[in-house]
């Protein structure tokens, strides 16, 4: 059999695979998609893609949930406060956020599609590093001209409150961890014990070390990879390291388009390219990745979906 024939047969099998592609983390409610949402969601339905609209402020959280309720077969949502918005006004928003979350959980219709809390965490990306300090991170009181340093305690307070709310309502966390792996793990370790079986949430847009990945796994978190893995080869070893059963794919759209869409606005449909890359790196078929990641999503995030819908299907391995 020629290579062309073999590839053609594989593509037919892949097209027959019933498991939806799951984009675990997108921002389809952002204004970047104004005017395009309907056409993008139509393409998602055509290509069997579902996504979670991740909240970053109270406003985008509510908008993401509204979108999920309008397109309930395609979209879900989280409510969350992103650390980059955790300044003095963020403390006021935190109180309003807590009230909104409580009302959402109590509303029978909303709670079926509000599936987690986040994105929340710590973000040190815009902070100058200090090599003289053991952890390399500047803190409040350090002698540096950087306005964001003073917001670290607020970031931490907003993050910890969302962890507490996740525990109170038994919801998974969508963790934002940018240049802050050790600090984020330190905070999470105050609330979760290493080696516990219970699922706690997902470390989104993971680009840390294997040791940091293992630390998240040990605390009960999964790890998601973006389109970065399609054009930065150094992360292939990390993808090989993380078990498929503890992994997700995400677009973080409208940001960070994968190959071959670099330079264009990202959409949840492009998660297909991330799935293909994971299959290539793992050395398994695309259908195996689709099955495993969908079942991961149903177990941990999309609990209203029937995980057994496709049990009669046997994927090509």
Segments (PLM) and residue ranges:
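Mid-domain alpha/beta scaffold segments of enzyme catalytic cores
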Residues: 1-317
């Amino acid at each position: 059999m020629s290579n062309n024939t073999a590839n053609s047969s594989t593509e037919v099998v892949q097209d027959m695979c019933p498991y939806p592609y799951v984009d675990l983390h997108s921002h389809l409610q952002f204004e970047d998609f104004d005017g395009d949402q309907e056409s993008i969601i139509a393409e998602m339905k055509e290509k069997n893609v579902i996504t979670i609209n991740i909240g970053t402020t109270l406003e985008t959280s509510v908008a993401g949930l509204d979108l999920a309720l309008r397109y309930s077969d395609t979209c879900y949502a989280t409510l969350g406060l992103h650390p980059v918005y955790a300044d003095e006004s963020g403390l006021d928003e935190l109180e309003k956020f807590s009230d909104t979350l409580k009302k959402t959980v109590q509303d029978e219709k909303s709670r079926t599609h509000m599936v987690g809390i986040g994105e929340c965490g710590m973000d040190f990306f815009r902070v100058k590093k200090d090599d003289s300090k053991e952890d390399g991170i500047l803190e409040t009181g350090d002698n540096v001209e950087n306005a964001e340093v003073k917001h670290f305690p607020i970031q931490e307070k907003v993050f910890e409150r969302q962890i507490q709310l996740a525990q109170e309502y038994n919801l998974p966390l969508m963790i934002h961890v940018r240049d802050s792996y050790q600090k984020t793990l330190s905070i999470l370790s105050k609330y979760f014990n290493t080696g516990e079986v219970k699922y706690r949430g997902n470390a989104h847009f993971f680009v840390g070390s294997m040791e940091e990945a293992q630390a998240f796994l040990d605390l009960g978190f999964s790890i998601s990879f973006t389109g970065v893995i399609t054009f930065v080869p150094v992360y292939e070893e990390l993808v090989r390291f993380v078990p498929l059963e503890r992994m997700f794919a995400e677009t973080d759209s409208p940001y960070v388009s994968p190959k071959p869409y670099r330079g264009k606005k990202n959409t949840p449909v492009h998660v297909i390219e991330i799935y293909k890359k994971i299959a290539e790196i793992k050395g398994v078929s695309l259908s195996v990745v689709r099955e495993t990641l969908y079942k991961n999503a149903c177990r941990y995030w999309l609990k209203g979906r029937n995980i057994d819908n496709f049990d009669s299907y046997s994927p090509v391995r």
